[in-house]
Amino acid sequence: MAAPGTPPPLAPETAGADSGGGSGEHRQLPELIRLKRNGGHLSEADIRNFVHALMDGRAQDTQIGAMLMAIRLQGMDLEETSVLTQALAESGQQLEWPKAWHQQLVDKHSTGGVGDKVSLVLAPALAACGCKVPMISGRSLGHTGGTLDKLESIPGFSVTQSPEQMLQILEEVGCCIVGQSEKLVPADGILYAARDVTATVDSVPLITASILSKKAVEGLSTLVVDVKFGGAAVFPDQEKARELAKMLVRVGMGLGLQVAAALTAMDNPLGRNVGHTLEVEEALLCLDGAGPPDLRDLVIRLGGAILWLSGQAETQDQGAARVAAALDDGSALHRFQLMLSAQGVDPGLARALCSGSPTQRRQLLPHARKQEELLSPADGIVECVRALPLACVLHELGAGRSRAGQPIRPGVGAELLVDVGQWLSRGTPWLRVHLDGPALSSQQRRTLLGALVLSDRAPFKAPSPFAELVLPPTTP
């Protein structure tokens, strides 16, 4: 996939000189692994050879794991990361859309968080603003939730759509949210599965290549990546998250993509609900023009940046105002209803979900068999509700999966009954857990109580999770 701004291929003699010797002939995989293990530079030919080995089965699982660990420990420079991204993108099918759509084709991606249901709200809101959003999303793995699993908690919703079906949905609705097929970026699928079991997830070049290779095949003009940092994020440190953000922007430019990266805090859950069905309910509240302020704020900010960068708004503020209007006037909710119907949900159910009250919606979606409330152990101001321990307990209860393909319980989750910054009296309920199995164990209760952090300072308004926006060097 030749893209504007991509560095020219290295000549064989240059590649050999930069990479620690050798000629233009393909190196064997053990030699490539040794080179990167020792901190060497992989040439374009080296990287493409490795990706070809993934695809034709020459690379053994042990060799894949060894190469990933070498990259994790030694890193990759901009050129190596760009070539890896491009090689992964070229390993499968490219999606093609009408040329007249190019400026409208946009997307958003998140590095993963707890309670992160932004995509469910943002995709239809952008469609209501005239965008085309061919969102290829993922499933939950570990403590982070997956957009596909949330949508599949809605009876009938199908995340499997052919390119032809995606084209039709984009024409009629303006957005679709689908899963990654075996034909789209298959080499990334191999690396993604291996990274999860080899402790190589938290690598800037590997994350960059994985995200951007999937987005490159979507044929986008503009992408905003929500890079999480904090206690429940891949990178707890904001500076490391900023490093990833800058790499995403620079590699995206080489692919001809207009990429910006938002740094957003992930210490507390986003919104008040965590768990697949509960997050769908909260997304519908936001699409009603209501919902928790932190969720609405993030949707509006990310959407405003996308409209501005794609040339569909003159400023970020103007773009944000358009997204807010789509939430408030019902047009985003209508697009969500159309998307549900287009992706397999019975039109009557889609209509009932989008027009019903919160109580009615809960009856239409899968829900857990019982609920337990936790009481505050002391008086104080809610300083923080740690997202990671909360997510880990919900994972144990069946809301998450430890391996790909493992079934989940869509109704399992938790509702926060308090907001960060508010006063909480001893004995007051602060968390409602929805569960299917036995009652919470004493250890699970201790873990959840440890997630609640109280202080003695004055009540305060919780800050927005949005920290900063990393932009390409030249912006509209």
From Swiss-Prot:
Role summary: Catalyzes the reversible phosphorolysis of thymidine. The produced molecules are then utilized as carbon and energy sources or in the rescue of pyrimidine bases for nucleotide synthesis.
Statement: the UniProt record of this protein carries the keyword Phosphoprotein: yes
Gene Ontology CC: cytosol
SMART domains reported in the protein's UniProt record: PYNP_C
Entry-annotated residues carrying Phosphothreonine: 6, 475
A molecular-function term among this protein's GO annotations: protein homodimerization activity
Domain of life assignment: Eukaryota
Oligomer and partners: Homodimer.
EC id: 2.4.2.4
Ranges of biased composition (kind: Pro residues): 1-11
Gene Ontology BP annotations: dTMP catabolic process; mitochondrial genome maintenance; pyrimidine nucleobase metabolic process; pyrimidine nucleoside metabolic process; regulation of gastric motility; regulation of myelination; regulation of transmission of nerve impulse
Family that this chain belongs to: Belongs to the thymidine/pyrimidine-nucleoside phosphorylase family.
Protein species of origin: Rattus norvegicus (Rat)
Keyword field: Glycosyltransferase, Phosphoprotein, Transferase
Catalysed reactions, as listed in the record: thymidine + phosphate = 2-deoxy-alpha-D-ribose 1-phosphate + thymine
Name of the featured protein: Thymidine phosphorylase
Pfam families named among the record's database cross-references: Glycos_trans_3N, Glycos_transf_3, PYNP_C
Region (Disordered): 1-26
InterPro entries on file: Glycosyl_Trfase_fam3, Glycosyl_Trfase_fam3_N_dom, Glycosyl_Trfase_fam3_N_dom_sf, Nuc_phospho_transferase, PYNP-like_C_sf, PYNP_C, Pyrmidine_PPas_bac/euk, Thymidine/pyrmidine_PPase
